[in-house]
Amino acid sequence: KVDLSLNIQADDNDEPFSLNALERYMLQAKLLDDAIGQGLTEPDIELIKRLKASGTLPMQPFDDLLLRQYQHDIKPLIGRTLFLKGEQASSHADIKLVFDLPITAGKSQQVLLQGRIDDISPKGLVNYRPGSAHGRDVLRLYLRHLCLMAMGHTHASYLLDMGHFHALAPITAERAHVLLADLLVLFYQGQQHPLCFMPRTSLAYVSCEGEHDERLQQALPEWLDEQSQLGEAAFGEGNEPHYQRLFSFPRDFSEDSFGALAERIYRPMVSLYLKDTLAQLEEFALNDGMSQGPANEHATDTQALAPHLNRNSAQGEQA
């Protein structure tokens, strides 16, 4: 008698045939850094050998298949990043900015913001990352962009991911200083009590139109993200433990708290922001797609820089 109902489970010690989401991200980041750092269109063969010998890849021949697939996936990103960087070596900017902030009632405090920003090319700041960029990544680019603008830089800033480029138009040093000061005030407020601000959900909210409840529902996928693009555990901001402990959706997401804060942080950024596919980057950059002009000196809403708006704004950050 043959029993065909045996439940054969894989041993925990079996060799994997693929990488999980975090392992895939880290491997692609290594491949990107190696190629772009050397100005090459593909990673160095020595890195490939070291990766194979590290024991972190699947067994042969699946390691070769995996590496070839990842190199194919990141090739457009490498090419567009090298195009933006150009042949000149990237430089850095030393940041030193002084602010008088109303941190306590009736009294201002002087704050020194000091640091260094790398990866500055003749076309502006150029950052890149594997996978898809979301609200947190765009906010990080925005903060660096404001620091550079406040120091007198006059070029756009770019973030490239696997399928799109994200660009921020230059503004005057005075305007950047004002925006940074407001964000610093919020930073100090956040040290006193939690702020109802989630980068991805907030950006999706600001990118939508309509009444508060309608915009909140359109931003809901960023909070839940039950259908993760990674095909594994949910990665929505609502699944992060510190948010779960503090905020409940939609009870704590009122227009006066969540909505007003999202608008305060992201609305000035959205007026400078453009997102498009990597295939459109070369044409955009060669046509001097973003330049500093009088229209954006005091931009506070999405109409102030109509030519610079996100061409995919209807999709927001869900792309």
Across the structure, where does each feature detected by a protein language model lie?
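Structural signature of nuclease core domains in nucleic-acid processing machines
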Residues: 1-319
